[in-house]
Structure formats: C-alpha cells, structure tokens
Amino acid sequence: MNKIEVMDWYQIKKHLYYTHDDFVRDIIALHLKKGALTDIYNYICKTSLFSIEDRFKGLAESIEDNICSEIITLFLDKRPIIRWYLNSTEQLEMDIDARFVDSLDIHNKICDFFTGLSCLIDDNIFLLDNIIKEKPLVLMIFNPQTSPQIIEDTLSLQQAT
C-alpha cells in the first residue's frame, strides 16, 4: 500500500477517478456506533469544505430516528461532489461523483474530509470501485489518525474488513 503523497495527480486520477466504466466511487464504513449519524451530520455542518441544501439544515436532532432513504448532497463550490445515503444507522453509505474531481486540490479536500470523518467515527472508511459488484475492490482506505492510503494491489472489501 502506498501513501497518498507517492502519486502525482495524473496517477491519482487514473487510479481512483477514472470514468470509463462509471462516474461514481462508493464510500462505505461498517459498524457505526449508536449516535454516529448525528455526529456525522454535525461534522458535515461544521466543516468549511462542503455545504448542504438548506432543507437539510437542522436535521441533527432527528436523523437517527428518521432513516428514510433520504439522500443529502454535499457541495464543493456549488458542485455536487458527495451524496450521503441515509439508509441505515449501522453503516455509512456515500458516493463521490468522479466527474467533478478534476484537480489535486479537490482530491485533497475529499481526503481531508474522509480522514476527519474516520477519526470522528473511529473506524476505517473505504473508497470502492463499485459496491454493487459481487466483490467490490477497495481503491483507498481512510484510517483514523493516519494518512489515507491508495491501494495499488487488488484488495476486496471482504479482505480489508
């Protein structure tokens, strides 16, 4: 596994954000603790990296109780970069729209966001090629208290967890 600093933007884009098969890269964290969704929501609202639609502001008090298959879009400079799927209180489900990750700066902001989020939930967060596949491949791991890691070898989600 290589740390993120080893690759230049061209290599990162080619490895993580290629769009010849799909425009979406899936994000998942398993085994969320009780109250984690509220913590994640508050983290999103407090970060200066992303903004959310006004209709989702003030949701913190009821987010754990009202899992309703809602989708919250996170915007970076008015571009819909990340979608958060409120399907479960037990795992984090998000995706990144790879079409809008067009610079190293945006990639680094995404890494900062997910590194901070992994510290908050005290669990690994995985960036996957396609969660729908039978054996999705892990492209990147965000670990609490460490730098993100790009996975250059083949690593399935089952192997990583």
Predicted regions and their residues:
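Acidic, proline/glycine-rich low-complexity IDRs
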Residues: M1-E5, H107, C111-T161
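Short, surface-exposed coil-to-beta transition loops
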Residues: V24-R25, D77-I81, K135-L137
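Long, contiguous binding/interaction regions
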Residues: N2-D8, L16, E90-L104, D123, ...
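A structural detector for beta-sheet-dominated domains
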Residues: M7, H31-K33, Y85-N87, D95-R99, ...
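Short, extreme N-terminal segment that most often corresponds to the first beta-strand
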Residues: M1-E53
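Ampiphathic alpha-helical segments that act as solvent-exposed interaction surfaces
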Residues: A29-S48, R99-L127
